[in-house]
Each structure stands twice: as C-alpha cells, then as structure tokens.
C-alpha cells in the first residue's frame, strides 16, 4: 500500500476567499460525491476512499488531499488527481454540480450548529478566531453568491501544481 498526500498552504478562515475556497474544495474532494471520489474510487477503483480538506489554524492554514492505494496505482492516482485539479483550473463547473454542492454545504453548516456539543465547538471556534455571530450568515451568503466563473478563478489562483507538495509512503 502507498499513502499519498498532496498539499500546500491555504486560505485562512478569516480570508475573503474562504467561502468560495470551501466550495471549490468540496467539489474536488470534500464529500462522497466529489470529483476525486467519482473518478479515483468509482471509475478507476484505485482506492476505497480519497478526500481533500482545508485545515484552518489561527496563524496559517493548509489544504491536503489524502488517500491510500495499492502500490501499482500510486503514479496513476497522482496523475488523476492533477487531471481533476487541471479541469477545475480550466473549465467552469456545471451549474447543476455547483448547486448540488452548495446545498450540501448549507446542510453541513447547519449540522455544525446542531446540538449542544456542536454549538460549544462553534463558540470555541469563534473565540479562537475572533469571529462574531454573523460569521456563519456571511459564509452562507458568500456561498450563495459564488458562480462557476468564481470557482474557476479560485482554482487558478490557489491550485498551481508547482506550489504543491507530493508525499508518498509505502512499499516501492
């Protein structure tokens, strides 16, 4: 087995591009119906799971793609990952896909506030980052306003493959 990690520094929670970046990341690998899951798991059968995520920290943030594959699929998997990134940097996301992911994120944001433990995590998050109660409303509004062209611009702005680190570990 090979573990594959691809990543780079990323937008922070308080950056203006954060909501759009969250949407972009979800399209690529942030949920089960993402492009990476559809391609690398469903179509190619290289892995049981692949995903991408953004980790926001107070001083710096990072973005990562993670998966495990059989050794013989390592290079092909990396190639497919970069094909999907290239598509997002060069082609607009279809409106139907964008709306599906927006609705997914709306539900995901609501789940972050559902229940006492989720609300306490949200409060901790707001305190750590100096956010006020309007933060979530602002995120939802920015997601709502995001267009296919904006997603294309964000992908081109933040996902230059030459700025990404690729790490693999496992048997050669």
Predicted segments, located by residue:
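His/Glu-based metal-binding/catalytic segments typifying zinc-dependent metallopeptidases
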Residues: 1-35
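Short, conserved catalytic/metal-binding micro-motifs enriched in Asp/Glu and His
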Residues: 22, 151, 166
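Active-site phosphate/pyrophosphate- and oxyanion-stabilizing loops and adjacent acidic/basic residues
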Residues: 38
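Low-complexity, intrinsically disordered Gly/Pro/Thr-rich segments
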Residues: 147-156
């Amino acid at each position: 087995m090979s573990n594959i990690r691809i990543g780079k520094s990323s937008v922070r929670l308080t950056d203006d591009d954060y909501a759009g970046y969250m949407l972009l990341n979800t399209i690529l690998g942030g949920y089960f119906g993402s492009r990476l899951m559809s391609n690398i798991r469903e179509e190619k059968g290289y892995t049981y799971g692949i995903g991408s995520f953004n980790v926001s920290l107070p001083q710096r943030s990072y973005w990562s793609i993670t998966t495990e594959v059989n050794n013989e699929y390592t290079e092909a998997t990396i190639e497919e990952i970069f094909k999907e990134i290239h598509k997002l940097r060069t082609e607009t996301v279809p409106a139907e896909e964008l709306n599906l992911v927006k609705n997914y994120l709306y539900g995901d944001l609501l789940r972050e506030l559902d229940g006492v433990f989720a609300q306490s995590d949200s409060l901790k998050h707001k305190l750590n980052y100096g956010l006020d109660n309007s933060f979530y409303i602002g995120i939802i509004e920015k997601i709502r306003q995001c267009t296919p062209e904006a997603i294309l611009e964000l992908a081109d702005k933040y996902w230059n493959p030459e700025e990404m680190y690729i790490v693999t570990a496992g048997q050669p």
